[in-house]
From Swiss-Prot:
THD domain mapped to chain residues: 88-233
GO molecular function: cytokine activity; death receptor agonist activity; identical protein binding; protease binding; transcription cis-regulatory region binding; tumor necrosis factor receptor binding
Protein's name according to its UniProt entry: Tumor necrosis factor
Function: Cytokine that binds to TNFRSF1A/TNFR1 and TNFRSF1B/TNFBR. It is mainly secreted by macrophages and can induce cell death of certain tumor cell lines. It is potent pyrogen causing fever by direct action or by stimulation of interleukin-1 secretion and is implicated in the induction of cachexia, Under certain conditions it can stimulate cell proliferation and induce cell differentiation. Induces insulin resistance in adipocytes via inhibition of insulin-induced IRS1 tyrosine phosphorylation and insulin-induced glucose uptake.
Subcellular location(s) of the protein: Cell membrane
Membrane topology, from the record: Single-pass type II membrane protein
Organism per entry: Macaca mulatta (Rhesus macaque)
Length: 233
């Protein structure tokens, strides 16, 4: 073998050496890329499944453990939702046959007195101390507007056992007529609802009343339009 042939063989071997050594490195790099892609897809699939089935999700609101950080009304509502339905409750409706007055009845459909509440002298008597939701609605109806201004009032009052004085808890005034119906013009009907509601601390034996000033304008055409009630919280 000549010297030139030996030199040519060495050069060919040197050129072939990088290609041979690059082969395993390229294979290893491809293997790592495949593994990374597989783990990425598997992780995304697992996360989707956990979100879909509710295993993980947005953090739920938690009530503070310290009772002093919760408002009294919130504590009462939470306590009410956890206890049996033995709390005082009342829902009375207006008597459509009582002319010229607003008379409450409990012996009617969708009316009730439960767990100690009494209806005496057209007033609801509170059976126990605590927070109560008090509410009432009336619906007035008229035809046309007279010359004198029509003012409709609706008031919920309390007579407490501690001081025996009538005090207004909730009150509202509305005027359905802005101007008098012109002479000869058609007297169009009008409707005016008034709703009152609020939460109050009451004592055992307190009496509550819901009154209006113009009972002749009350609308009894449909049931469920005029009512009065309390719910212990």
């Amino acid at each position: 073998m000549s010297t030139e042939s030996m030199i040519r063989d060495v050069e060919l071997a040197e050129e072939a050496l990088p290609r041979k050594t690059a082969g395993p490195q390229g294979s290893r790099r491809c293997w790592f890329l495949s593994l990374f892609s597989f783990l990425l897809v598997a992780g995304a699939t697992t996360l989707f499944c956990l979100l879909h089935f509710g295993v993980i999700g947005p953090q739920r609101e938690e009530f503070p453990k310290d009772p002093s950080l919760i408002s009294p009304l919130a504590q009462a509502v939470r306590s009410s939702s956890r206890t049996p339905s033995d709390k005082p409750v009342a829902h009375v409706v207006a008597n459509p046959q009582a002319e010229g007055q607003l008379q409450w009845l409990n012996r009617r459909a969708n009316a009730l007195l439960a767990n100690g509440v009494e209806l005496t002298d057209n007033q609801l008597v509170v059976p126990s101390e605590g927070l109560y939701l008090i509410y009432s609605q009336v619906l007035f109806k008229g035809q046309g507007c007279p010359s004198n201004h029509v003012l409709l009032t609706h008031t919920i009052s309390r007579i407490a056992v501690s001081y025996q004085t009538k005090v207004n808890l909730l009150s509202a005034i509305k005027s359905p007529c802005q101007r008098e119906t012109p002479e000869g013009a058609e007297a169009k009907p009008w409707y005016e609802p008034i709703y009152l509601g609020g939460v109050f601390q009451l004592e055992k034996g307190d009496r509550l009343s819901a009154e209006i000033n113009l009972p002749d304008y009350l609308d009894f055409a449909e049931s469920g339009q005029v009512y009065f009630g309390i719910i212990a919280l």
